[in-house]
Amino acid sequence: MNAKFILLLVLTTMMLLPDTKGAEVIRCSGSKQCYGPCKQQTGCTNSKCMNKVCKCYGCG
C-alpha cells in the first residue's frame, strides 16, 4: 500500500514538473549581464540575475 502510494506520488510529481527543453540557461554574476541576452530572447531588457542565472521577464 505505501509502496504504491509513493510510486504514484513520484509519477505525479514527474508529470507536473515543467518541461524546460529548449530553455537557454544564461549564467550571470550581475543583472547587467542579463540585459543583452534577454533582449535577444524576449525583445525587452527586463531581467534580473538570481542565483547566478538570468531571469528574463519580457515586455509589459
From Swiss-Prot:
Q: Where are the transmembrane segments?
A: none
> Per the record's keyword annotation, is Chloroplast included, yes or no?
no
- Could you confirm whether the keyword Secreted appears in this record? yes
Domain of life per record: Eukaryota
Record Gene3D superfamilies: Knottin, scorpion toxin-like (3.30.30.10)
Stored InterPro entries: Scorpion_toxin-like_sf, Scorpion_toxinS_K_inh
Subcellular compartments: Secreted
Site Basic residue of the functional dyad: give positions.
Answer: 48
Q: Where would you say this protein principally sits, based on its record?
A: secreted
Report the sequence similarity comment from the record: Belongs to the short scorpion toxin superfamily. Potassium channel inhibitor family. Alpha-KTx 06 subfamily.
The domain-related comment in the record is:
Has the structural arrangement of an alpha-helix connected to antiparallel beta-sheets by disulfide bonds (CS-alpha/beta).
What is the protein name given in its UniProt record?
A: Potassium channel toxin alpha-KTx 6.10
